[in-house]
Every structure is written in structure tokens, then in C-alpha cells.
């Protein structure tokens, strides 16, 4: 039996479940998630391997209207992910019929020369009759095959994977079978910290936050020491992140440390600092300094 492999770009509107899908397929958290849209800022690769083949998933920032330099960067990364790939997963929210946001993305991909599969997510929230109705609606509007799934519950993910493999070419194993992401540890650690800020803070605060790992080294007692700066755009945001008597930053640190220890399989001392970098999302130089490089 021939070995198949290829690169699969997962695109869609913000908060349709792209990161949840990849994490569930890989069986490990390689992409951060939160209930808020636009959590993902970089294109992240998740690697799915089985004896007969390998799929390299590329999770992308949600496609939306750009409002600042950071948004421009995120959209650039989303569109870059469509280059040199073998299959596109166009992810949509099954709670809704085909809408303007979906149409905008459809217009970007309808002319591509690679197979497109529509993954209609969140079917666990709607009854079977509506699932069938929405599936037909998306098939008629796009002309692509539509697979109803629940990324969070794992429903029909095996069907989606089989459909992807039918379109993949014969190819090499790009990554070792025990590798689940190509991202360096520092990137993943910074993202896990940022995820906790996203989940625990409110309103516009998380969108103006960046996390930069300043130091990461193993100590003599086999503990990993990590010093990270959390950058906020405003003094008021810094206060919210720190919280009353430091309660919020302690909670962010505790929850992030628990996940980082799972990732690194070692005890972690997480040293978090909150700093102000005014309007960094508006300045290209600062966007790059925060690690979002083109």
C-alpha cells in the first residue's frame, strides 16, 4: 500500500472551531483555544500520522476585516497558508446557514486548483433535521463536499480524515511519527500563557495582549525556569491582568503552569511580568518585536 502525505490548510471565520479540530485530531493541544474569536494569530502546524500516511494541518487566524497592523499580519498568514498545499478544509458553523462571512471566504478559494472540503462544525448543538438542511444549504452554495462534524466531541472526525486521505498524493513522511507540531517550545509556552489571558480577562483586554518569553532554562533541581513578559496596551489593561492584590496574574500563572508542565513533562517555575507597550498592534515594528513576523 502506497504512503500518502500532504499539507492541509484549515480556514474559516473567527471562532468556528479550527484550533479545536486540529487539537482533537492530533490528540494533544498544539493550538490555543478560547471562546473568543481571533485567538489564533500565527499559522500553526499540527501533525497527524498513521501507518499509511501523514497529514500536516495548518491552522490559520480567522479571516476577518483588518483594523490594525496585527490584523493585517494575521490575514497575511491566513492567505499564505493557501500556498503550496494539497487540500483546503473550509470550516463553517453549522448553527447558521451560509452567510456573508462564509461567502467572503468562499470567493477567495473558489478558484483554487486544490480540493476543498467543507467541515460543518458544532452539529452537537442542533437537531438532525437541521443538520441535514444546513448540509444541503452549504453543498448548494459552495459545490464542495460537506461533512458535518463536532470538533469538540470528535463526531465524524474519522470520516473527515478519510475524505482528506482520498485527496492526498503519494509522498514522504515529512516529520517523525511521534512529532505533533513543528513549533518551537518557546512559541507554544508563550501561546499557552496568552490563552489563559484570553480566557480569564474581559472585553478588549486580551486582544491587546502579547506574550514574549525572555528566558527559559533548566535549573539544577530539574525545574524549568521560564520568565515571560505579558505586554498590555494600556495602564488600565495592566491593572486588570494583575488584578486586585495580584489575584488575576496568580490565576493566569497557575493555570498556564499546569499546562506547560504537561507539555514539557517537568516541573516549571513560571515568572510572569506585566508591562505596557502603548498601541503596539498599530506599529509594524512592535508587531514584529512581539514575534509576529512576516
UniProtKB/Swiss-Prot annotation:
Listed PROSITE patterns: G_ERA (PS51713), KH_TYPE_2 (PS50823)
Keywords: Cell inner membrane, Cell membrane, Cytoplasm, GTP-binding, Membrane, Nucleotide-binding, Ribosome biogenesis, RNA-binding, rRNA-binding
Region (G4): 121-124
Gene Ontology, cellular component aspect: cytosol; plasma membrane
Region (G2): 38-42
Domain KH type-2: residue ranges: 201-278
First-listed, main subcellular location of the protein, grouped into a coarse class: cytoplasm
Entry function: An essential GTPase that binds both GDP and GTP, with rapid nucleotide exchange. Plays a role in 16S rRNA processing and 30S ribosomal subunit biogenesis and possibly also in cell cycle regulation and energy metabolism.
Protein name: GTPase Era
Native organism: Halothermothrix orenii (strain H 168 / OCM 544 / DSM 9562)
Species lineage: Bacteria, Bacillati, Bacillota, Clostridia, Halanaerobiales
Gene name for this UniProt entry: era
